[in-house]
Amino acid sequence: MESDPMFIGFGYDRHPLVEGRRLVLAGVEIDAPLGSLGHSDGDVLSHAIIDALLGAGCLGDIGTWFPETKEYKDANSLDLLKETVKILEERGFSVVNVDATVVASIVKLSPYREKIVENLKSALETSRVNVKFKSGNTLGFEGEERGISAYAVCLVEEKGCTKST
């Protein structure tokens, strides 16, 4: 039995934390004293996953598809993630799974995990989603509460690909 080809993607994003901005992860607003500075809503988790998915499909990166233009100013990154899934599907790919890690010490993120994962499962059209949170242990700009970062890895499957023998 032959299986469809599978491809791995890796994504990473980081943003400074500043006053006057919201902190959003996978469309979930986090109650925090500082928010993520970015052209869109600054959702580092969605951005890292977008880059992982585009990487798996050899389709460039988030800036290729969603440049820093007026069209994407303050954009909802969960919507951009849904659009990325459509871009992959149009090219014959489907998301198998995503595993991500968010690094931040500004606020405890684990109480938000269930809603974050729920949003990602819906956006990615897969039940195979895992999100982990790390504090940075007082190291780096995440540990010093000056920033937030996210790492993501994904597996996508190319559907209906025929192999010649």
Swiss-Prot record:
Involved in the biosynthesis of isopentenyl diphosphate (IPP) and dimethylallyl diphosphate (DMAPP), two major building blocks of isoprenoid compounds. Catalyzes the conversion of 4-diphosphocytidyl-2-C-methyl-D-erythritol 2-phosphate (CDP-ME2P) to 2-C-methyl-D-erythritol 2,4-cyclodiphosphate (ME-CPP) with a corresponding release of cytidine 5-monophosphate (CMP). Pathway: Isoprenoid biosynthesis; isopentenyl diphosphate biosynthesis via DXP pathway; isopentenyl diphosphate from 1-deoxy-D-xylulose 5-phosphate: step 4/6. Pfam families: YgbB (PF02542). Its cofactor is a divalent metal cation. Keywords: Isoprene biosynthesis, Lyase, Metal-binding. Homotrimer. The lineage of its organism: Bacteria, Thermotogati, Thermotogota, Thermotogae, Thermotogales. The record marks H39, S135 as: Transition state stabilizer. 4-CDP-2-C-methyl-D-erythritol 2-phosphate binds at D13, R14, H15, H39, S40, D61, I62, G63, F141. It catalyses: 4-CDP-2-C-methyl-D-erythritol 2-phosphate = 2-C-methyl-D-erythritol 2,4-cyclic diphosphate + CMP. A divalent metal cation binds at D13, H15, H47. One of its GO terms (biological process) is isopentenyl diphosphate biosynthetic process, methylerythritol 4-phosphate pathway. Belongs to the IspF family. Its EC number is 4.6.1.12. PANTHER family: 2-C-METHYL-D-ERYTHRITOL 2,4-CYCLODIPHOSPHATE SYNTHASE, CHLOROPLASTIC. GO terms for molecular function: 2-C-methyl-D-erythritol 2,4-cyclodiphosphate synthase activity; metal ion binding. The gene is ispF. Binds 1 divalent metal cation per subunit. This is 2-C-methyl-D-erythritol 2,4-cyclodiphosphate synthase. The keyword Metal-binding applies. InterPro entries: MECDP_synthase, MECDP_synthase_CS, MECDP_synthase_sf. It comes from Thermotoga maritima (strain ATCC 43589 / DSM 3109 / JCM 10099 / NBRC 100826 / MSB8).
